[in-house]
Amino acid sequence: MRPAVLGSPDRAPPEDEGPVMVKLEDSEEEGEAALWDPGPEAARLRFRCFRYEEATGPQEALAQLRELCRQWLRPEVRSKEQMLELLVLEQFLGALPPEIQARVQGQRPGSPEEAAALVDGLRREPGGPRRWVTVQVQGQEVLSEKMEPSSFQPLPETEPPTPEPGPKTPPRTMQESPLGLQVKEESEVTEDSDFLESGPLAATQESVPTLLPEEAQRCGTVLDQIFPHSKTGPEGPSWREHPRALWHEEAGGIFSPGFALQLGSISAGPGSVSPHLHVPWDLGMAGLSGQIQSPSREGGFAHALLLPSDLRSEQDPTDEDPCRGVGPALITTRWRSPRGRSRGRPSTGGGVVRGGRCDVCGKVFSQRSNLLRHQKIHTGERPFVCSECGRSFSRSSHLLRHQLTHTEERPFVCGDCGQGFVRSARLEEHRRVHTGEQPFRCAECGQSFRQRSNLLQHQRIHGDPPGPGAKPPAPPGAPEPPGPFPCSECRESFARRAVLLEHQAVHTGDKSFGCVECGERFGRRSVLLQHRRVHSGERPFACAECGQSFRQRSNLTQHRRIHTGERPFACAECGKAFRQRPTLTQHLRVHTGEKPFACPECGQRFSQRLKLTRHQRTHTGEKPYHCGECGLGFTQVSRLTEHQRIHTGERPFACPECGQSFRQHANLTQHRRIHTGERPYACPECGKAFRQRPTLTQHLRTHRREKPFACQDCGRRFHQSTKLIQHQRVHSAE
């Protein structure tokens, strides 16, 4: 797509030519406004508008082009698919017809899909193709859309200024209209575009100044003549009090972004600049037309002429409001001098208002595309759906980022450890692990963090809201105080303060993130996002080996170790290795004898919280897991799963040595000790070893002379239940 500039810089219009008529497209305003706007559109225009003359040599030109391209595409932030989307969007906009292209560019779409939706909306608008006319305002001709005389209020009869002698234009078929407007029908817009590209006015157009003070005074005078009072009477409001007018009088300029009517200058000579009247109208979906004066050799300014595009012949001539249905816009132009240096500065008096205010929350946006994107938050619209898992997104860029989780593509790779990431921001955060950098420091306690989100989460512990009232972070690079860091509630110590702060959320009960489905609240946003997948059923992380899917990437990582056999967490006491760190933590309590979880009913203590939960069901009698076949209830879901295999006959655990299968994995583990000869349970009294723990328990009763199983008939006691069953058969035979 060509940038929004006209022609070549080395062609200057001849000085002896009169005013040149051009059509100023809406996209030119957007493109020139972007020259001082540090946004993606400004970066694109800087790249497309680069000229070889701006560099001192070919090497510098190539280096500048590379840098401008990098600033536009930002490969360190965007993925290849996102950069491709930018190029497709640019080409799509460039392929549109000129009028539609200007109107779509004015909305600044963020993706090709959004641009296509805008084009569809424009095609469905009522109204046929527009025709353009030549409007002569007191002796000067400009291009405008065709309008009816009833669109304007006539001026009082005044004597027009005497035009200067000069060559007369060939006779044309004209229509007389108020204000001395002479209208002649011209060809379609497409012919105007050809004229723009090949005419003498092929120069760069940039943002513009407001009216000069003397021009502003003349504008106000003529406006008083055009709109002296309303039709309700001579005492009605003037144009300055019009309810839809957004008049600004800054730096001597009068303008309400919008419809501009050019006045004939009293001393209309070569090189003079004519003033403009700006009255309100809607430029959001309007075409622009204008006249640009031929510049002097030193370079100078020229004002653009804006005429309303919504003036229809069917407009009611008796309408009391000549400015009905109009809104703000303003465009003026600036010339570049032949030396290539721009003159003037952007006008600050009345910029283009292209966004709007959200009706729901009142938030204001400078661009309509951002407003439309924001409104999807309130409507819940998510038009971009992932074909793999069905998850929907409000923006196509979010969908592309999400799809990388399915393809396992991680284009941003760490040069130190080789770990890949979907987003470059995650790579930058990961690099701080190697460098030890923690730039975000809490001003309250001095704790440093690698990520700002962790700092904001931490500040809630001190009571500082993560907003304008929060204390600013400490200077980056400040060292963290040395550990360990003990918890004031339970005295547990941690090597890092960040881990301590996460642990303290258990005691403080800080749960700032709530689920809209079930109301459950969480202390961390990441945990809330994982919880939402329980309701949606989403399992975006699938194993490439067996196809099993998981809700969390960490679960997939742990599952892969089943296929690879990796057990990275080893016990320092006995050397036993585990696939998960929590399993190792639980195992270490076997050596230390630690049992931190106590039952409040009976005082029995457990090494695992899960075991405490299961134990408490013996007091409450709760059996939340029921079999769908026989209705039998269980206190543990694992027991229900094992029970259901009785109905299905499933025996998923097979011995690789003899092929015998089992319903439970524990039974397979015990069986394999027959082949390996392993006897891990040894008696501390006599040293005898056993393959199963229950067998060791029974053996210990022989040393302790325990006989817990008593016969109800004769009172005889036994140390094994099997011995009691055999004994009871004696009484049954009698």
Curated annotation (Swiss-Prot):
Stretch list, region Disordered: 144-196, 459-485
SUPFAM superfamilies, per database record: beta-beta-alpha zinc fingers (SSF57667), Retrovirus capsid dimerization domain-like (SSF47353)
Gene Ontology BP annotations: negative regulation of transcription by RNA polymerase II; positive regulation of transcription by RNA polymerase II; regulation of DNA-templated transcription
Main localization category: nucleus
Gene Ontology molecular functions: DNA-binding transcription activator activity, RNA polymerase II-specific; DNA-binding transcription factor activity; DNA-binding transcription factor activity, RNA polymerase II-specific; DNA-binding transcription repressor activity, RNA polymerase II-specific; protein homodimerization activity; RNA polymerase II cis-regulatory region sequence-specific DNA binding; transcription cis-regulatory region binding; zinc ion binding
Zinc finger (C2H2-type): 356-378, 384-406, 412-434, 440-462, 485-507, 513-535, 541-563, 569-591, 597-619, 625-647, 653-675, 681-703, 709-731
Induction: By retinoic acid.
Places the protein is found: Nucleus
Domain SCAN box: 44-125
Pfam family, one: SCAN
Tissue note: Preferentially expressed in differentiating myeloid cells. Detected in osteoblasts.
Keywords linked to the UniProt accession: DNA-binding, Isopeptide bond, Metal-binding, Nucleus, Phosphoprotein, Repeat, Transcription, Transcription regulation, Ubl conjugation, Zinc, Zinc-finger
Residues modified as Phosphoserine: 111
Cellular component terms per the entry's GO annotation: nucleoplasm
Bias (Pro residues): 157-170, 465-485
Record location of the Glycyl lysine isopeptide (Lys-Gly) (interchain with G-Cter in SUMO2) cross-link: 723
Transmembrane segments: none
Subunit field text: Homodimer.
Function text: Binds to target promoter DNA and functions as a transcription regulator. Regulates transcription from the PADI1 and CDH2 promoter. May be one regulator of transcriptional events during hemopoietic development.
Family (UniProt): Belongs to the krueppel C2H2-type zinc-finger protein family.
Listed name of the protein: Myeloid zinc finger 1
Biological source species: Homo sapiens
Gene that produces this protein: MZF1
